[in-house]
Amino acid sequence: MPSLKDLKNRIGSVKNTRKITKAMQMVAAAKLRRAQEAAEAARPFAERMTAVMTGLAGSVGSSESAPRLLAGTGSDKVQLLVVMTAERGLCGGFNSSIVRLARAHAAKLLAEGKTVKILTVGKKGREQLRRDLGQHFIGHVDLSEVKRMGYPVAQGIARDVLDRFDKGEFDVATIFFARFQSVISQIPTAQQVIPAVFEGEGEVNSLYDYEPSEEGVLADLLPRGVATQIFTALLENGASEQGARMSAMDNATRNAGDMINRLTIQYNRSRQAAITKELIEIISGAEAL
């Protein structure tokens, strides 16, 4: 049975831990608010661009003059997986859920006889995937120095991906990230970005004249579309990470409080037992006299 001193030290240690987790929860809440605002600010631009490209893609269709980023290479043999995770942990199952989805997708592709290449964004995903898929790594993007996510970061990643596509290094590119729904709900998502996939209705092209041509405008917009999708995914990931961290630290703070209560009860009982024992010894000694 632990001594009173040991129990007191444990209570003090857990109280210090609770202070840390509470502070991390408050910091995550502030960062989450900023991340949500950034995602909401970028959404109208992304939606408008997607609508225009969807309309153009519908007009261009599968014609021979369709841009390569839309038509593809005609093969899906080589697949690039861009796995986006956080640089830090202590955010519940945020990182592992994205990695789990990417790992399952890679296993499915490998079982079909396809070639898999992996580009990691964020340290935590790279650490987890290295164990069984490290031989498929072709690059890594370090975000440890990025204080606030901006469009230039997404442009850099998109430029690397597009350069690899132009060199014929892969046929299909899919990004993996967590779509933010709420503080307690982040949905692991796989989204194909190359060749471009458009769903729903776009802009009515009869209202516009495109120069030099619809194909030319679409060819110019598609690389920007890839960067925009990556930027949106990074913003969603940022909000999801902070939401998951806020939830995890809230749980840790409440668990620490429960542990403090249990240890305090144990401490009081041990102290009471020690006092009772001393009183019995004093009374027994007095009776012996």
Swiss-Prot record:
Molecular function via GO: ATP binding; proton-transporting ATP synthase activity, rotational mechanism
Gene Ontology terms describing biological process: proton motive force-driven plasma membrane ATP synthesis
SUPFAM superfamilies, A to Z: ATP synthase (F1-ATPase), gamma subunit
Pfam family, one: ATP-synt
Location (main, coarse): membrane
Classification via InterPro entries: ATP_synth_F1_ATPase_gsu (IPR035968), ATP_synth_F1_gsu (IPR000131), ATP_synth_F1_gsu_CS (IPR023632)
An annotated GO cellular component: plasma membrane
Sorted UniProt keywords: ATP synthesis, Cell inner membrane, Cell membrane, CF(1), Hydrogen ion transport, Ion transport, Membrane, Transport
NCBIfam families found in the cross-reference section: ATPsyn_F1gamma, PRK05621.1-4
Subunit structure: F-type ATPases have 2 components, CF(1) - the catalytic core - and CF(0) - the membrane proton channel. CF(1) has five subunits: alpha(3), beta(3), gamma(1), delta(1), epsilon(1). CF(0) has three main subunits: a, b and c.
Cited HAMAP family: ATP_synth_gamma_bact
PANTHER family given in the database record: ATP SYNTHASE GAMMA CHAIN, ATP SYNTHASE SUBUNIT GAMMA, MITOCHONDRIAL
The name this protein goes by in its record: ATP synthase gamma chain
Gene: atpG
